[in-house]
Curated annotation (Swiss-Prot):
The gene is PRNP. It is found in: Cell membrane; Golgi apparatus. It is a lipid-anchor; GPI-anchor. Residues 1-22 form the signal peptide. This is Major prion protein. Monomer and homodimer. Has a tendency to aggregate into amyloid fibrils containing a cross-beta spine, formed by a steric zipper of superposed beta-strands. Soluble oligomers may represent an intermediate stage on the path to fibril formation. Copper binding may promote oligomerization. Interacts with GRB2, APP, ERI3/PRNPIP and SYN1. Mislocalized cytosolically exposed PrP interacts with MGRN1; this interaction alters MGRN1 subcellular location and causes lysosomal enlargement. Interacts with KIAA1191. Residues 52-95 have a biased composition (Gly residues). The normal, monomeric form has a mainly alpha-helical structure. The disease-associated, protease-resistant form forms amyloid fibrils containing a cross-beta spine, formed by a steric zipper of superposed beta-strands. Disease mutations may favor intermolecular contacts via short beta strands, and may thereby trigger oligomerization. Belongs to the prion family. Glycans are attached at N181, N197. Keywords: Amyloid, Cell membrane, Copper, Disulfide bond, Glycoprotein, Golgi apparatus, GPI-anchor, Lipoprotein, Membrane, Metal-binding, Prion, Repeat, Signal, Zinc. Its primary physiological function is unclear. Has cytoprotective activity against internal or environmental stresses. May play a role in neuronal development and synaptic plasticity. May be required for neuronal myelin sheath maintenance. May play a role in iron uptake and iron homeostasis. Soluble oligomers are toxic to cultured neuroblastoma cells and induce apoptosis (in vitro). Association with GPC1 (via its heparan sulfate chains) targets PRNP to lipid rafts. Also provides Cu(2+) or Zn(2+) for the ascorbate-mediated GPC1 deaminase degradation of its heparan sulfate side chains. Cu(2+) 3 binds at H77, G78, G79. Residues 23-231 are annotated as: Interaction with GRB2, ERI3 and SYN1.
Length: 254
């Protein structure tokens, strides 16, 4: 972690030094760079001709009549007629490029809504996330009939749970209670729409199965949450990071 902080400090100092050198470099060119090299030089013989930089009348930078930078008539920077910056008719930038320009296709909101629904199923559940698939636990219900029924029907029960981030709950019980309710509700609704119904025995077994999976999900999310907080605390308390932050404050204040 300390090595990472040193590398960040070195990278920032190198970047800041390069920016400072770029600011000190003189801008290329000088007076009268680009275009005609003799702006005030007219054609011998009076004022019959305007100042020229090469080419015929009306050519500030060469080309045919009306060509500021070369090309055919009406070509500011070369190309065909009506081409501000080259290309075919009606191409390039400027207002002329809008002629005969095809209109942008309108976004089909039905397609957008369908894509959102297909790619973010949990988005409509108010911030719930879908956990990774788990193996359904082997549970004993107290009698042989229920144990056999569970083994024969366990594939019909959820193997993923819905949950919210652990930092939104005060304790594990609240997390598990919410997780069980939303998971069974969503699974029941989804399965019912496919023409399959659950009995009271199914619901009883699902509650036991989902409860164990929600406990496992809570333990996993809690560990990841606290590991992330600890890593952030170690990073920002390391000497290189403190030095980097102090250097940034010095640059801002100075």
């Amino acid at each position: 972690m300390a090595n990472l902080g040193y590398w960040l400090l070195a990278l920032f100092v190198a970047t800041w030094t390069d920016v400072g050198l770029c600011k000190k470099r003189p801008k290329p060119g000088g007076w009268n760079t680009g275009g005609s090299r003799y702006p005030g030089q007219g054609n011998p013989g009076g004022n019959r001709y305007p100042p020229q930089g090469g080419g015929t009348w009306g050519q500030p930078h060469g080309g045919g009549w009306g060509q500021p930078h070369g090309g055919g008539w009406g070509q500011p920077h070369g190309g065909g007629w009506g081409q501000p910056h080259g290309g075919g008719w009606g191409q390039g930038g400027g207002t002329h490029s809008q002629w005969n320009k095809p209109s942008k296709p309108k976004t089909n909101m039905k397609h957008v809504a369908g894509a959102a629904a297909a790619g973010a199923v949990v988005g409509g559940l108010g911030g719930y996330m879908l956990g990774s698939a788990m193996s359904r636990p082997m549970i004993h219900f107290g009698n042989d009939w229920e144990d056999r029924y569970y083994r024969e029907n366990m594939y019909r029960y959820p193997n993923q749970v819905y949950y919210r981030p652990v930092d939104q709950y005060n304790n594990q019980n609240n997390f598990v209670h919410d997780c069980v309710n939303i998971t069974i509700k969503q699974h029941t609704v989804t399965t019912t729409t496919k023409g399959e119904n659950f009995t009271e025995t199914d619901v009883k077994m699902m509650e036991r199965v989902v409860e164990q999976m929600c406990v496992t999900q809570y333990q996993k999310e809690s560990q990841a949450y606290y590991d992330g907080r600890r890593s952030s605390a170690v990073l920002f308390s390391s000497p290189p990071m403190i030095l980097l932050i102090s250097f940034l404050i010095f640059l801002i204040v100075g």
